[in-house]
Protein backbone atom coordinates (compact mmCIF):
# COMPACT_ATOMS: atom_id res chain seq x y z
CA UNK A 1 0.00 0.00 0.00
CA UNK A 2 1.18 3.54 -0.86
CA UNK A 3 0.28 6.67 1.11
CA UNK A 4 -1.21 9.80 -0.42
CA UNK A 5 2.23 11.34 -0.77
CA UNK A 6 3.34 8.37 -2.83
CA UNK A 7 5.77 6.99 -0.22
CA UNK A 8 5.69 3.36 1.01
CA UNK A 9 3.65 2.62 4.10
CA UNK A 10 5.36 2.21 7.45
CA UNK A 11 4.81 -1.56 7.41
CA UNK A 12 6.65 -1.98 4.12
CA UNK A 13 9.31 0.53 5.15
CA UNK A 14 10.17 -1.61 8.17
CA UNK A 15 10.73 -4.68 6.01
CA UNK A 16 14.47 -5.50 6.17
CA UNK A 17 16.36 -5.28 2.94
CA UNK A 18 17.54 -8.62 1.64
CA UNK A 19 21.28 -9.24 1.83
CA UNK A 20 22.84 -8.98 -1.64
CA UNK A 21 24.15 -12.34 -2.77
CA UNK A 22 27.80 -12.36 -3.74
CA UNK A 23 28.48 -13.75 -7.20
CA UNK A 24 29.98 -17.23 -7.22
CA UNK A 25 33.65 -17.21 -8.12
CA UNK A 26 34.69 -19.39 -11.02
CA UNK A 27 36.45 -22.43 -9.58
CA UNK A 28 39.20 -22.50 -12.22
CA UNK A 29 39.96 -18.81 -11.65
CA UNK A 30 40.15 -19.50 -7.92
CA UNK A 31 42.49 -22.46 -8.45
CA UNK A 32 44.70 -20.33 -10.72
CA UNK A 33 44.90 -17.61 -8.07
CA UNK A 34 45.69 -20.20 -5.40
CA UNK A 35 48.44 -21.92 -7.37
CA UNK A 36 50.00 -18.61 -8.42
CA UNK A 37 50.95 -18.02 -4.78
CA UNK A 38 54.06 -19.47 -3.21
CA UNK A 39 52.12 -20.74 -0.20
CA UNK A 40 49.51 -22.38 -2.41
CA UNK A 41 52.05 -24.59 -4.18
CA UNK A 42 53.90 -25.25 -0.92
CA UNK A 43 50.65 -26.33 0.75
CA UNK A 44 49.96 -28.92 -1.95
CA UNK A 45 53.51 -30.22 -1.64
CA UNK A 46 53.06 -30.42 2.13
CA UNK A 47 49.85 -32.43 1.73
CA UNK A 48 51.62 -34.77 -0.72
CA UNK A 49 54.61 -35.17 1.61
CA UNK A 50 52.64 -36.16 4.70
CA UNK A 51 50.18 -38.26 2.73
CA UNK A 52 53.16 -40.26 1.45
CA UNK A 53 54.58 -40.54 4.98
CA UNK A 54 51.23 -41.72 6.31
CA UNK A 55 50.99 -44.31 3.53
CA UNK A 56 54.50 -45.54 4.36
CA UNK A 57 53.67 -45.72 8.08
CA UNK A 58 50.51 -47.70 7.41
CA UNK A 59 52.34 -49.90 4.90
CA UNK A 60 54.67 -51.06 7.65
CA UNK A 61 51.80 -53.07 9.15
CA UNK A 62 50.20 -56.22 7.86
CA UNK A 63 50.00 -56.93 5.03
CA UNK A 64 52.98 -54.82 3.88
CA UNK A 65 53.09 -53.05 0.54
CA UNK A 66 55.14 -54.59 -2.27
CA UNK A 67 58.79 -53.56 -2.16
CA UNK A 68 58.55 -51.67 -5.47
CA UNK A 69 55.58 -49.59 -4.25
CA UNK A 70 57.35 -48.78 -0.98
CA UNK A 71 60.48 -47.70 -2.87
CA UNK A 72 58.44 -45.41 -5.12
CA UNK A 73 56.70 -43.84 -2.13
CA UNK A 74 60.03 -43.22 -0.38
CA UNK A 75 61.49 -41.68 -3.52
CA UNK A 76 58.41 -39.48 -3.93
CA UNK A 77 58.56 -38.40 -0.28
CA UNK A 78 62.24 -37.48 -0.57
CA UNK A 79 61.72 -35.50 -3.77
CA UNK A 80 58.75 -33.56 -2.41
CA UNK A 81 60.62 -32.79 0.82
CA UNK A 82 63.53 -31.41 -1.17
CA UNK A 83 61.20 -29.34 -3.35
CA UNK A 84 59.61 -27.74 -0.28
CA UNK A 85 63.00 -26.55 0.96
CA UNK A 86 63.32 -24.36 -2.14
CA UNK A 87 60.34 -22.30 -0.91
CA UNK A 88 62.05 -21.48 2.40
CA UNK A 89 63.96 -18.55 0.87
CA UNK A 90 60.72 -16.65 0.30
CA UNK A 91 59.58 -17.53 3.82
CA UNK A 92 62.90 -16.25 5.20
CA UNK A 93 62.33 -12.88 3.51
CA UNK A 94 58.75 -12.93 4.80
CA UNK A 95 60.03 -13.36 8.37
CA UNK A 96 62.44 -10.44 7.95
CA UNK A 97 59.65 -8.22 6.64
CA UNK A 98 57.40 -9.27 9.52
CA UNK A 99 60.10 -8.26 12.01
CA UNK A 100 60.50 -4.90 10.29
CA UNK A 101 56.75 -4.30 10.29
CA UNK A 102 56.54 -5.18 13.98
CA UNK A 103 59.36 -2.74 14.76
CA UNK A 104 57.60 0.15 13.00
CA UNK A 105 54.06 -0.78 14.08
CA UNK A 106 54.30 -2.74 17.35
CA UNK A 107 51.23 -4.59 18.59
CA UNK A 108 49.94 -2.82 21.72
CA UNK A 109 49.11 -6.05 23.57
CA UNK A 110 51.96 -8.35 22.44
CA UNK A 111 55.38 -8.31 24.11
CA UNK A 112 58.21 -7.55 21.63
CA UNK A 113 60.09 -10.64 22.86
CA UNK A 114 57.28 -12.88 21.60
CA UNK A 115 57.43 -11.19 18.21
CA UNK A 116 61.20 -11.74 18.11
CA UNK A 117 60.76 -15.40 19.04
CA UNK A 118 58.03 -16.00 16.47
CA UNK A 119 59.50 -14.25 13.44
CA UNK A 120 63.18 -14.33 14.37
CA UNK A 121 63.14 -18.04 15.17
CA UNK A 122 61.28 -18.84 11.96
CA UNK A 123 63.71 -16.67 10.00
CA UNK A 124 66.73 -18.52 11.42
CA UNK A 125 65.15 -21.88 10.60
CA UNK A 126 64.29 -20.88 7.02
CA UNK A 127 67.77 -19.41 6.51
CA UNK A 128 69.52 -22.60 7.63
CA UNK A 129 67.18 -24.68 5.48
CA UNK A 130 68.72 -23.06 2.40
CA UNK A 131 72.04 -24.78 3.17
CA UNK A 132 70.22 -28.08 3.68
CA UNK A 133 68.54 -27.66 0.30
CA UNK A 134 71.80 -26.83 -1.49
CA UNK A 135 73.57 -29.77 0.15
CA UNK A 136 70.83 -32.29 -0.67
CA UNK A 137 70.57 -30.92 -4.21
CA UNK A 138 74.29 -31.67 -4.65
CA UNK A 139 75.63 -28.13 -4.99
CA UNK A 140 77.31 -28.11 -1.56
CA UNK A 141 79.29 -31.01 -0.09
CA UNK A 142 77.26 -32.88 2.52
CA UNK A 143 80.11 -32.53 5.03
CA UNK A 144 79.47 -28.76 5.14
CA UNK A 145 76.09 -29.47 6.75
CA UNK A 146 76.89 -30.82 10.22
CA UNK A 147 74.17 -32.33 12.40
CA UNK A 148 74.69 -29.49 14.88
CA UNK A 149 73.50 -26.99 12.26
CA UNK A 150 70.32 -29.01 11.81
CA UNK A 151 69.68 -29.05 15.56
CA UNK A 152 70.13 -25.27 15.73
CA UNK A 153 67.48 -24.91 13.04
CA UNK A 154 65.08 -27.26 14.83
CA UNK A 155 65.49 -25.42 18.14
CA UNK A 156 64.93 -22.09 16.36
CA UNK A 157 61.74 -23.48 14.86
CA UNK A 158 60.54 -24.66 18.28
CA UNK A 159 61.11 -21.19 19.76
CA UNK A 160 59.22 -19.73 16.79
CA UNK A 161 56.24 -21.99 17.54
CA UNK A 162 56.28 -20.94 21.22
CA UNK A 163 56.23 -17.27 20.27
CA UNK A 164 53.58 -17.78 17.60
CA UNK A 165 51.29 -19.72 19.97
CA UNK A 166 51.58 -17.01 22.63
CA UNK A 167 50.76 -14.29 20.07
CA UNK A 168 47.79 -16.19 18.67
CA UNK A 169 46.39 -16.82 22.15
CA UNK A 170 46.39 -13.05 22.70
CA UNK A 171 44.77 -12.46 19.31
CA UNK A 172 42.09 -15.09 19.98
CA UNK A 173 41.27 -13.41 23.30
CA UNK A 174 40.97 -10.02 21.56
CA UNK A 175 38.65 -11.41 18.88
CA UNK A 176 36.47 -13.15 21.47
CA UNK A 177 36.19 -9.88 23.41
CA UNK A 178 35.30 -8.10 20.16
CA UNK A 179 32.49 -10.54 19.39
CA UNK A 180 31.11 -10.29 22.94
CA UNK A 181 31.27 -6.48 22.84
CA UNK A 182 29.33 -6.32 19.57
CA UNK A 183 26.68 -8.68 20.94
CA UNK A 184 26.33 -6.56 24.07
CA UNK A 185 25.91 -3.47 21.88
CA UNK A 186 22.85 -5.10 20.35
CA UNK A 187 24.33 -6.50 17.17
CA UNK A 188 22.70 -9.79 16.30
CA UNK A 189 24.66 -12.95 15.61
CA UNK A 190 23.67 -12.64 11.94
CA UNK A 191 24.92 -9.05 11.65
CA UNK A 192 27.76 -8.48 9.21
CA UNK A 193 30.23 -7.22 11.83
CA UNK A 194 29.67 -10.22 14.12
CA UNK A 195 29.87 -12.67 11.20
CA UNK A 196 33.14 -11.10 10.06
CA UNK A 197 34.67 -11.24 13.54
CA UNK A 198 33.47 -14.84 13.96
CA UNK A 199 35.12 -15.88 10.68
CA UNK A 200 38.38 -14.22 11.77
CA UNK A 201 38.13 -15.98 15.13
CA UNK A 202 37.62 -19.37 13.47
CA UNK A 203 40.64 -18.89 11.19
CA UNK A 204 42.76 -17.76 14.14
CA UNK A 205 41.72 -20.82 16.16
CA UNK A 206 42.65 -23.04 13.22
CA UNK A 207 46.05 -21.33 13.05
CA UNK A 208 46.48 -21.93 16.77
CA UNK A 209 45.71 -25.64 16.37
CA UNK A 210 48.16 -25.79 13.47
CA UNK A 211 50.93 -24.18 15.55
CA UNK A 212 50.32 -26.63 18.38
CA UNK A 213 50.47 -29.58 16.00
CA UNK A 214 53.64 -28.25 14.36
CA UNK A 215 55.24 -27.62 17.76
CA UNK A 216 54.51 -31.21 18.82
CA UNK A 217 56.21 -32.45 15.65
CA UNK A 218 59.19 -30.17 16.32
CA UNK A 219 59.46 -31.45 19.90
CA UNK A 220 59.63 -34.91 18.37
CA UNK A 221 62.58 -33.80 16.23
CA UNK A 222 64.33 -32.28 19.27
CA UNK A 223 63.85 -35.36 21.46
CA UNK A 224 64.80 -37.86 18.78
CA UNK A 225 61.27 -39.22 18.24
CA UNK A 226 60.99 -40.93 21.62
CA UNK A 227 57.82 -42.24 23.23
CA UNK A 228 54.48 -41.22 21.76
CA UNK A 229 56.17 -38.71 19.46
CA UNK A 230 58.06 -41.60 17.90
CA UNK A 231 54.93 -43.00 16.26
CA UNK A 232 55.33 -42.60 12.50
CA UNK A 233 51.57 -42.88 11.96
CA UNK A 234 50.78 -40.23 14.60
CA UNK A 235 53.40 -37.77 13.32
CA UNK A 236 52.37 -38.26 9.69
CA UNK A 237 48.71 -37.73 10.63
CA UNK A 238 49.64 -34.58 12.55
CA UNK A 239 51.59 -33.26 9.58
CA UNK A 240 48.69 -33.99 7.23
CA UNK A 241 46.29 -32.14 9.56
CA UNK A 242 48.62 -29.13 9.61
CA UNK A 243 48.87 -29.22 5.82
CA UNK A 244 45.09 -29.33 5.35
CA UNK A 245 44.64 -26.36 7.70
CA UNK A 246 47.17 -24.44 5.61
CA UNK A 247 45.26 -25.30 2.44
CA UNK A 248 41.99 -24.10 3.96
CA UNK A 249 43.45 -20.80 5.19
CA UNK A 250 45.20 -19.93 1.96
CA UNK A 251 42.25 -21.04 -0.19
CA UNK A 252 39.96 -18.63 1.67
CA UNK A 253 42.46 -15.78 1.55
CA UNK A 254 43.00 -15.74 -2.23
UniProtKB/Swiss-Prot annotation:
Keywords: Membrane, Peroxisome, Peroxisome biogenesis, Transmembrane, Transmembrane helix. The keyword Membrane applies. One of its GO terms (molecular function) is identical protein binding. Residues 1-113, 248-254 are cytoplasmic. InterPro entries: PEX11. Pfam families: PEX11 (PF05648). Residues 135-227 are lumenal. It is a multi-pass membrane protein. One of its GO terms (cellular component) is peroxisomal membrane. The keyword Transmembrane helix applies. Its main location: membrane. The chain crosses the membrane at residues 114-134, 228-247. It is found in: Peroxisome membrane. Belongs to the peroxin-11 family. This is Peroxisomal membrane protein 11-2. It comes from Oryza sativa subsp. japonica (Rice). The lineage of its organism: Eukaryota, Viridiplantae, Streptophyta, Embryophyta, Tracheophyta.
Amino acid sequence: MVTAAGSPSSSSARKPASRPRLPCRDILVHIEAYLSRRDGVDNLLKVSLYAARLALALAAGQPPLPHAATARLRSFESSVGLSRKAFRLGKFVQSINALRAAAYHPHPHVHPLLVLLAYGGQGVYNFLEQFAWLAKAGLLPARLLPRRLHRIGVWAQLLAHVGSIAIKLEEVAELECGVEARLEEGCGEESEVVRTLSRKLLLKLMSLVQDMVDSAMTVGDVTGRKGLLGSSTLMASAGLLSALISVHKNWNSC
